[in-house]
Amino acid sequence: TRTDDKPGVNRNMEMQQQQGGFIGHRPRLASFNRASKQLDREKRPVPSGPDPIHHSIPSHAPQHPPSYGKAPYEDDKSIASPGLSNLIGPPPFLDRY
């Protein structure tokens, strides 16, 4: 059985070697990179177009919501301030009377 075990280990080693071969195939990715470079040339103009539009859209969208939110908040504060002061004001007057 021991001798049998030894061959099994050898088989494992062979499998590992195969994996190494697979890594050797990896260089194919390098060739893909070259193709990607060509695509980059086409890609550059594409993003440049949508980029400005996309920028203007987000800039407008965020600006509107904040201003809207601020307006109501300020109104609430101004209303709350006078309301509280009015409520506090009457009691002293009544007391004086």
Swiss-Prot record:
It comes from the Eukaryota. Residues 1-97 are annotated as: Disordered. GO terms for molecular function: receptor serine/threonine kinase binding. GO terms for cellular component: apoplast. One of its GO terms (biological process) is cell-cell signaling involved in cell fate commitment. The keyword Secreted applies. Glycans are attached at P50. Keywords: Developmental protein, Differentiation, Glycoprotein, Hydroxylation, Secreted. The modification Hydroxyproline is found at P47, P50. Belongs to the CLV3/ESR signal peptide family. This is CLAVATA3/ESR (CLE)-related protein ESR2-C. It comes from Zea mays.
